């Protein structure tokens, strides 16, 4: 019985929410292992929509859900999201939700710093959600973060906050901002401590025990591999590692526990925020994809940039994340197009290349090299078997498999979880 890592293979927004929900019914434990509440996803169950950005998707199924140490946790958002789910009739208790005691916290100073940097006229605009994710990770690697476990030790919390503010207040002075008092942060933390502490645990131990007992573990990735801090389109990336390897480091369960990596892949390409996007379409086709695909961010509401499927970046992600198979989503959005293009390579300074270069300058200069395939007039929406798909749609899917070097394990044809074609069960050894 394999444990499964779900990772976005593009720039996020690939439709991971539905696939994770589909898989969570087969899983015993669902784990968030990176990111924060900056990337949202929507689950539709029995006609009810659940919008999550921090809590694992398994909660709506009553499965044990874990927030790993690789996640940065905004405690106030945590409480608000828990209460929102309870308001929708979901039972959220420590029996079904655990938070890593060594997870770092996002504080108000992180959110304010994030917004100040992004709103500045100087420097590079990355397109962050301004939710404090980046500054919180900075404090983590700077060894000055306040972690969840620190809330259990009030006697040592003050000196930790003092050390944290020694850094942040120096930044604030340089930006012309008023300094933050220690009492302000202490009050912020103590006001929410009683509401988050019942959920904390040594999640590495919990996961190890469940694995040894034969539980199926699903690792739920956020965002996409092209936003990875190392392997993405740097500096237009997020502040954590989003490739599949982070599932081990961000949960405390060793890499040998990972059995199958499923890459969630949209049948076309989208991106939110700034950064290179070789196949972006600023024309009526781009508008068609955005409108039909409802391409607006769950967290920010920002309109997503849209373009043709880019086999180069997905092929690269297949390698950097060790993807065994992909779940191809939103195929139905392409219904009705007379022809469909796929980017098979790039041209860089007159030369053909089959990879996305690392430098920002080169990424901005690459030009897509396309193959054109005939589209289809029939609908794929709601298809639940290969026989339900138009012949040209099947050819499109098969060609994607050839180009990226990975098979399609699942195919999604609508937001409804039942409209899914299963080719390979990721949980099956």
Swiss-Prot record:
Binding site residues for GTP: 12-18, 40-42, 304, 330-332, 412-414
Residues at the catalytic site: 13, 41
Cofactor: Mg(2+)
Record's keyword annotation contains Ribonucleoprotein: no
Free-text remark on how the cofactor is bound: Binds 1 Mg(2+) ion per subunit.
Major localization class: cytoplasm
Enzyme's top EC category: ligase
Keyword GTP-binding: yes
GO biological process entries: 'de novo' AMP biosynthetic process; IMP metabolic process
Assigned EC number: 6.3.4.4
Gene3D superfamilies documented for this protein: Adenylosuccinate Synthetase, subunit A, domain 1, Adenylosuccinate Synthetase, subunit A, domain 2, Adenylosuccinate Synthetase, subunit A, domain 3
GO cellular component: cytoplasm
Residues that coordinate or bind substrate: 298-304
Binding-site residues, IMP: 13-16, 38-41, 129, 143, 223, 238, 302
GO molecular function, one term: adenylosuccinate synthase activity
Subunit relationships: Homodimer.
Function: Plays an important role in the de novo pathway of purine nucleotide biosynthesis. Catalyzes the first committed step in the biosynthesis of AMP from IMP.
Family: Belongs to the adenylosuccinate synthetase family.
UniProt-recorded name of the protein: Adenylosuccinate synthetase
Native source organism of the sequence: Brucella canis (strain ATCC 23365 / NCTC 10854 / RM-666)
Lineage: Bacteria, Pseudomonadati, Pseudomonadota, Alphaproteobacteria, Hyphomicrobiales
């Amino acid at each position: 019985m394999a444990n499964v890592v779900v990772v976005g293979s593009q720039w996020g927004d690939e439709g991971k929410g539905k696939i994770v929900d589909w898989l969570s019914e087969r899983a015993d434990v669902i784990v968030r292992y990176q990111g924060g509440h900056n990337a949202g996803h929507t689950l539709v169950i029995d006609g009810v929509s659940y919008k999550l950005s921090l809590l694992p998707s398994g909660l709506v199924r009553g499965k044990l859900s874990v927030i790993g140490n690789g996640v940065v946790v905004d405690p106030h958002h945590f409480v608000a999201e828990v209460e929102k789910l309870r308001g929708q009739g979901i039972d959220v208790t420590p029996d079904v939700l655990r938070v890593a005691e060594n997870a770092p916290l996002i504080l108000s100073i992180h959110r304010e710093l994030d917004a100040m940097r992004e709103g500045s006229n100087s420097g590079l605009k990355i397109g962050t959600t301004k939710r404090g994710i980046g500054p919180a990770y900075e404090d983590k690697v700077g060894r000055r973060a306040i972690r969840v476990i620190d809330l259990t030790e009030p006697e040592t919390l003050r000196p930790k906050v003092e050390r944290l503010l020694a850094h942040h207040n120096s930044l604030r002075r340089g930006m012309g901002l008023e300094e933050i008092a220690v009492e302000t942060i202490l009050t912020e933390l103590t006001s929410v401590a009683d509401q988050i502490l019942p959920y904390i645990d040594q999640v590495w131990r919990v996961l190890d025990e469940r694995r040894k007992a034969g539980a199926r573990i699903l690792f739920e990735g956020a965002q996409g591999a092209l936003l990875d801090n190392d392997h993405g389109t740097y500096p237009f990336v997020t502040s954590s590692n989003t490739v599949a390897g982070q599932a081990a480091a961000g949960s405390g369960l060793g890499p040998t526990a990972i059995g199958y990596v499923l890459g969630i892949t949209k049948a076309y390409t989208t991106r939110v925020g700034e950064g290179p996007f070789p196949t972006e379409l600023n024309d009526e086709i781009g508008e068609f994809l955005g409108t039909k695909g409802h391409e607006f961010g769950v967290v920010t509401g920002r309109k997503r940039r849209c373009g043709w499927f880019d086999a180069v970046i997905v092929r690269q992600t297949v390698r950097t994340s060790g993807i065994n198979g992909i779940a191809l989503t939103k195929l139905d959005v392409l219904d009705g197009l007379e022809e469909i293009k796929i980017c098979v390579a790039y041209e860089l300074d007159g030369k053909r290349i089959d990879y996305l270069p690392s430098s920002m300058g080169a990424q901005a200069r690459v030009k897509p090299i396309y193959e054109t395939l005939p589209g289809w007039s029939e609908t794929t929406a709601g298809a639940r078997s290969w026989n339900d798909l138009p012949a040209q749609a099947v050819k499109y899917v098969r060609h994607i498999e050839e180009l990226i070097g990975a098979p399609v394990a699942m195919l999604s044809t609508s937001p409804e979880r039942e409209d899914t074609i299963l080719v390979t069960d990721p949980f099956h050894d």
